[in-house]
Amino acid sequence: MFERIGIVGAGAMGRGIAQLFASAGKQVWLHDARSASISEALRFNRELLERGVAKGRLSAAELDATLTRMQAAPALADLSGCDLVIEAIVENLEAKQALFIELESLLAEDTVLATNTSSLSVTRIAAACQHPERVAGFHFFNPVPLMKLVEVVRGERSDPQVIERLVKLAEEAGHFPAITPDTPGFLVNHAGRAYSTEAQRILAEGIADAEQIDRILRDGPGFRMGPFELFDLTGLDISHAVMESVYQQFYQDPRYTPSYQAAQRVAAGLLGRKTGQGYYRYENGQQIRTPEPQWRPIVVERPFWLDSQDAELRGRLAALLCGAGTQLETGEAPSERAICLITPLGEDASTMIARLDLPATRSIAFDLFADFDRRRVLMRQPALDPALEAQAQQALSHDGVPVEVINDSPGFVSQRVVASIVNLCCEIAQKGIADPQILDRAITLALGYPKGPLGFAEHYGAGRILAILEAMQGCYGGEARYRPSPWLRRRVRLCLPLTAPDRPVAG
């Protein structure tokens, strides 16, 4: 067990780690190259804990005991009695290596060295040490006391006992330890690439604007924040750097391709909240959203003809249209007056219209994939008559639920984003980076998704996810970005749950 913990770096991460372990009963010493930063961090933690007392979350006695356990370490040598030292300094390989070299000269040989790096190789940091076996990754998420996850990263030469001890320490502090090998992005930053890069791809293709994409993903699949809100909150410079880093570390695998538009916005200083403008504008720190378009009511004169890919979902859509008082056609083919409402899964509208030999001027797509009680999505295609688009929008918004109209896209917005998340996480499982159930819990804890990838697959159906990916890949001419993971494909083909494990490789 670890009882004396040193922390190097008194920024947001370092002070959060200090508070976490002091609250868990550990003696903590906090060091920073700037002595003023240590004082600021300890004062910040004291004020935060005092607010906890005021709200009844801890007693005055617990406050005093916790503060007593957090001590300043003005000199690095003051950490010499620690049995664990966690670095939380600048994200720079040479700086971290230099720190660990100096720490090795001051600490006992059995003291464990942990790095809080979010993107650098733990193995490369440890390579500078005389005893790389005592080095491991211990990656927390900000704010540390509230984000109940820590990635415990095995470097190539990390001692298994070091990993076990860090796991136990995390559990003592009430955090979920996700053990992961030393791979690009570790676990969470790796899995999170699907949400961010797919949203950027949708924007770059002119399918929808940033605010539309955010609204669709909040109100359909139920994400707490849209991807572009998240870019603005995190800072696009930081997010784009992570996207580029993961892409390069995986040797330009198309799954991780970042956005050239994001690079341009970074160069222009459109970074989000911290610069007052990103994908949204900010005044006094408050986001300014563009008002949603208000459509003039019109008379729906045309009947609707629905495709019949899914009988249950078709019934829900028919009931919605009947509620608007529209006429529905039930024939196998549409009449010459009917608006054809199609429901592609993974295909774009143009492909499905051509496949079904439907009249392009009268055909528009509706997304039945995600819940549509809060927001609905129509997808136009280049040949559509705008007057008929307006009638479709009127009919589907009669009950006050807003309707987004986007341009033609394989998989709309929700389908392609959710399918990309599930697919990437299946690939992570295939590579042995994490067990699917561990991955599921880690993602919901760290990223705040409404469901983990397994939850998404269970809710929407793994078979439907595979169908979306296969159709998208076909629409994009076989593009490798959308290739289905073997993990997903095999389990769907064999009717197995995505949690079904592979057997360990012998040897």
What label would you give each PLM region?
Residues 24-26, 175-182, 210-409, 416-420, ...:
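NAD(P)-dependent Rossmann-like dehydrogenase/reductase catalytic/cofactor-binding core
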Residues 37-40, 51-113, 120, 322, ...:
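Rossmann-like NAD(P)-binding element
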Residues 2-6:
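Beta1/beta-strand and adjacent pyrophosphate-binding region of the FAD-binding site
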Residues 30-33:
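Conserved acidic E/D residue at the C-terminus of a beta-strand in Rossmann-like folds
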Residues 98-147, 154-167, 340-389:
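Rossmann-fold NAD(P)-binding glycine/threonine-rich loop
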Residues 14-15:
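N-terminal Rossmann-fold NAD(P) dinucleotide-binding loop
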Residues 10-11:
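Glycine-rich Rossmann-fold phosphate-binding loop(s) that bind the pyrophosphate
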Residues 21:
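Aromatic pocket-lining residues of Rossmann-like dinucleotide-binding sites
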